């Protein structure tokens, strides 16, 4: 079975597009081959800045012959019907078969579609793939109609086996497929022929091209950390930058340079961001001082002077970039010292947050008031929380954040310290944006928590108020992320703040003049939205959706910390034998009771009387229910849900014995009513802990 090698050679492909392009090439080609009837053993996709490559092993040499039988009209059907059948099959009358079935003689057409050779199918699939390739952006060049991310220069398409290799014949917009490629643009630009994937990969290596992006990443990181270690330094990890740089070079050459002394006083985040965004440099720190003192750059070629000229040029460009950063830093510090952070924030009055939600200054005023209300609920000083909220977004007007928006919050914390504000306020300037995602750090300082909650809840309340809610996959204002942030802030800090109590004042601050709206529906919708995000969060931790629903049905479900404690205890309980068996007993009791109440048109909730107990099983269940009630109440009061579940578990054996020996629907009406009331007691006792009717199974 032959192996297939495809290389699409072009001008430089943007690094950010390469990983997706590899997967798209693999999927489009292999899916197309399979749809055409070919099979294969394995496939792998690779990329460098100038080439997309696909290797398919164990490809079948041709597609199978397909035989299709189609049933037609009766043999004595009108001529028009038979003619229509012939047209649909492409056969003549003499090629039809006549077979007997229950309805008599029927015409059948047997259509055989011969297999096609692999080269023909590959050419067809590859042309379709190239013409329909889903680049985020593409271009045309010259006079052709072909579109590609950058001008496509050559196509290598080769089928090879033990007998040799053959070029797949195809021509596309003047490009004819061949068996040759180029090496490194500068170090080995000559073309060379290949006979298969292993030969291709080996010759590329000798031509200074490292084909596998993951190998380039490993080589870059290994060499960078080795050079840093030799000087007692450490490279700051940056997985995204490493992936991007690996997509910029075919033959990585790691070089380390020094940062000018004039710039070492800049905040490390500024140095790292400037070097990463503008130069694609890695930052290198001195563990002894904690400062970023050097940088690592990755060249795409070896040079006779071992990179000295490259480092010199990079150093000049870096100095210019860092001079700009230093200017921004010093200019911002002067503003802070003369006008303070609140003075810096004055410009936010002219910055629109949303045309229906006011300016950034309006938003800050709402967050300040809300942070003051939330502060006591999370153990923070109301005055400090209000002060932090007032200045937390001041750095949005700074020159540094204007140049590097990703430093918002970080620069605010530096400027707050420069202004002499309390450390809790400085920390809140940075931390109030967190958490930004499911794995981001969660603030724990009370002032930071208060401002972070106020920021996110104001955003949610505002957009909910104006009807800008997430729909399907669309969430332009990142409201799902904001809701998850609120959830993680409350849970991580074990906060007992009730969402309903926070959301109402947040909604009220979005009142427009003469607005008399009832916010209750908005609050309930928003609380339901929080519950949906909480379900996703807890499912990722292994808690089933029905367990969460059983706890959501209980009072106080806007206290997320209490809700999660209950869900965790119930989840653990249901994984035990006692939990599983009690659930079955509860469901049996609930089903019998529900059916009886529907049939009789009454509710059996008047309390069972022990004096009507006729059997030991009934008397034992009475005693067990009394004991459970006495234990569950204090346990729930203490929020010890594990103890409440344990008390509920003690009902398992008495309930089992009751159903084994007692007929609930007795002929005696008094006994029947008493026993149904007892089933209600079982349901009511369990319902104090969780709504078990929502549990599946």
Swiss-Prot record:
Entry superkingdom: Bacteria
Main location: cytoplasm
Gene: glyS
This protein's UniProt keywords: Aminoacyl-tRNA synthetase, ATP-binding, Cytoplasm, Ligase, Nucleotide-binding, Protein biosynthesis
HAMAP family: Gly_tRNA_synth_beta
Keyword Lipid biosynthesis: no
Any GO BP: arginyl-tRNA aminoacylation
GO molecular function: arginine-tRNA ligase activity; ATP binding; glycine-tRNA ligase activity
Matches recorded under InterPro entries: DALR_anticod-bd, Gly-tRNA-synth_bsu, Gly-tRNA-synth_heterodimer
Pfam families in UniProt: DALR_1, tRNA_synt_2f
Subcellular location: Cytoplasm
Similarity comment: family membership: Belongs to the class-II aminoacyl-tRNA synthetase family.
Name assigned to this protein: Glycine--tRNA ligase beta subunit
EC number: 6.1.1.14
Subunit structure comment from the entry: Tetramer of two alpha and two beta subunits.
One GO CC annotation: cytosol
């Amino acid at each position: 079975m032959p192996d297939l090698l495809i290389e699409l050679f072009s001008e430089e492909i943007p690094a950010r597009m390469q990983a997706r392009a590899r997967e798209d090439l693999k999927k489009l080609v292999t899916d197309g081959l399979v749809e055409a009837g070919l099979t294969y053993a394995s496939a792998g996709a690779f990329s460098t800045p100038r080439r997309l490559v696909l290797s398919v092993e164990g490809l079948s040499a041709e597609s199978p012959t397909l035989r299709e039988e189609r049933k037609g009209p009766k043999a004595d059907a009108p001529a028009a019907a038979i003619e229509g059948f012939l047209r649909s099959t492409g056969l003549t009358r003499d090629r039809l078969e006549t077979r007997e079935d229950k309805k008599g003689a029927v015409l059948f057409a047997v259509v055989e579609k011969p297999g096609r050779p692999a080269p023909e199918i590959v050419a067809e699939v590859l042309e379709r793939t190239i013409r329909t390739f889903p680049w985020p952006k593409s271009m045309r060049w010259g006079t052709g109609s072909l579109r590609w991310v950058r001008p496509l220069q050559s196509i290598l398409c080769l089928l090879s086996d033990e007998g040799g290799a053959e070029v797949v014949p195809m021509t596309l917009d003047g490009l004819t497929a061949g068996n040759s490629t180029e090496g490194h643009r500068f170090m080995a630009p000559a073309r060379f022929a290949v006979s298969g994937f292993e030969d291709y990969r080996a010759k590329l290596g000798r031509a200074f091209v490292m084909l596998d992006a993951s190998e380039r990443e490993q080589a870059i990181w290994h060499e960078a950390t080795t050079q840093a270690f030799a000087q007692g330094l450490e490279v700051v990890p940056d997985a995204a930058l490493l992936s991007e740089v690996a997509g910029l070079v075919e033959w990585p050459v790691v070089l380390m340079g020094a940062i000018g002394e004039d710039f070492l006083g800049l905040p490390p985040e500024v140095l790292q961001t400037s070097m990463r965004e503008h130069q694609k440099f890695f930052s290198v720190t001195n563990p002894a001082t904690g400062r970023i003192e050097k940088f690592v750059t990755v060249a795409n070629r070896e040079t006779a002077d071992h990179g000295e000229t490259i480092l010199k040029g990079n150093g000049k460009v870096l100095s210019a970039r860092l001079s700009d950063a230093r200017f921004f830093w010093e200019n911002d510090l002067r503003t802070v010292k003369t006008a303070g952070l609140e003075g810096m924030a004055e410009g936010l009055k002219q910055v629109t947050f949303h045309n229906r939600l006011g300016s950034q200054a309006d938003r800050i005023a709402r967050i300040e008031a809300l942070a003051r209300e939330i502060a006591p609920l999370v153990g923070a000083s109301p005055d400090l929380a209000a002060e932090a909220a007032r200045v937390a977004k001041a750095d949005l007007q700074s020159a540094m954040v204007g140049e590097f928006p990703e430093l918002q919050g970080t620069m605010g914390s530096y400027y707050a310290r420069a202004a002499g504000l309390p450390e809790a306020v400085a920390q809140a300037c940075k931390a109030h944006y967190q958490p930004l995602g499911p794995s981001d750090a969660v603030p724990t300082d009370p002032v930071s928590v208060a401002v972070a909650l106020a920021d996110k809840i104001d955003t949610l309340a505002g957009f909910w108020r104006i009807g800008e809610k997430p729909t399907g996959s669309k969430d332009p204002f990142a409201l799902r992320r904001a809701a998850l942030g609120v959830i993680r802030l409350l849970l991580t800090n074990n906060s007992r703040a009730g969402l309903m109590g926070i959301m109402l004042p947040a909604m009220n601050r979005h009142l427009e003049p003469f607005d008399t709206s009832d916010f209750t529906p908005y609050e309930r919708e928003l609380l339901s939205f929080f519950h949906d995000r909480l379900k996703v969060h807890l499912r990722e931790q292994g808690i089933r959706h029905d367990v969460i629903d059983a706890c959501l049905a209980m009072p106080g479900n806007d206290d997320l910390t209490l809700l999660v404690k209950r869900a965790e205890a119930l989840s653990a309980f249901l994984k035990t034998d006692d939990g599983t068996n009690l659930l079955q007993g509860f469901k049996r009791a609930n089903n019998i009771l529900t059916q009886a109440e529907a049939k009789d048109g009454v509710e059996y909730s008047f309390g069972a009387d022990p004096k009507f107990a006729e059997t030991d099983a009934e008397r034992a269940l009475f005693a067990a229910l009394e004991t459970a009630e006495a234990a569950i109440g204090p346990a729930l009061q203490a929020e010890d849900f594990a103890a409440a579940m344990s008390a509920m578990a003690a009902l398992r054996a008495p309930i089992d014995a009751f159903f084994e020996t007692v007929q609930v629907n007795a002929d005696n009406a008094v006994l029947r009513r008493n026993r149904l009331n007892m089933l209600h007691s079982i349901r009511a006792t369990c319902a104090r802990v969780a709504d078990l009717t929502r549990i599946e199974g």
